[in-house]
A protein has these predicted regions:
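Charged, low-complexity intrinsically disordered regions
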Residues: 3-203
Length: 203
């Protein structure tokens, strides 16, 4: 298929189906907390290294089932999809979400973090940023990162533990793999080096 060829051109591996294994591996990503359904799984899985970083891309589907309030009407199913582009980093970090208004609203309500304001009015107008660690949010959303994100299409970003993820509310769009991988790789490069320095242990 075209997606197989796209993965091959990037030197990456493709697997059509991996069950729920990747969702379990990345269960800490909050997007999974709003998923419920009678059937779930990871499809169109692409893995490997891109610009020196381990990366994983996949579509996650789940099926919801509704019973009719009328005895004579059949039940119906709805197939829902998210797609993830994940870069695995060498250090763990606090949870941080950067997204357009409404995209992660259910997550925000569950987590309860307040919006973080930035000096850049354009950035604050475009994105809702939430984290329990405000200092880390400012370190990540430094001036170069803000300039870069303002120059990109609106993205939905979640960073937690070792995963830097782009999240989309539909299946992966063919032909966008390379550009999405370049985005997560660029964001990783714009993170200050000191964030990856070993933290001194408490006495």
């Amino acid at each position: 298929t075209a997606l197989v060829e796209e993965a091959r051109d990037l030197g990456l591996s493709f697997d059509a189906y991996q069950g729920d294994s990747l969702a379990n591996k990345y269960r800490f990503i909050d997007q999974f907390s709003v998923v419920s359904g009678v059937s779930k799984g990871c499809i169109n899985v692409i893995t490997g290294e891109f610009e020196g970083h381990p990366v994983t891309l996949f579509d996650y589907y789940y099926v919801t089932k509704e019973n009719s309030v009328w005895w004579w009407a059949p039940s119906w199913e709805q197939h829902c999809y998210f797609s993830f582009i994940i870069l695995d980093m060498e250090s763990d970090f606090p949870e941080l979400t950067i997204a357009k208004e409404g995209f992660l609203s259910k997550i925000a309500q569950a987590v309860g973090y307040r919006d973080i304001d930035f000096e850049s009015h354009a950035f604050s107008q475009r994105y809702v940023v939430r984290s329990k660690d405000k200092k880390f949010a400012y370190d990540f959303c430094n001036a170069k990162m803000i300039d870069y994100l303002l120059d990109q299409p609106i993205l939905n970003i979640e960073l937690q533990k070792h995963a830097l993820a782009l999240v989309f509310d539909d299946q992966h769009e063919l032909g966008r793999t390379r550009s999405h991988l370049r985005r997560v790789s660029k964001m990783r490069s714009l993170m200050p080096n000191y964030l990856f320095d070993p933290q001194p242990s408490e006495a």
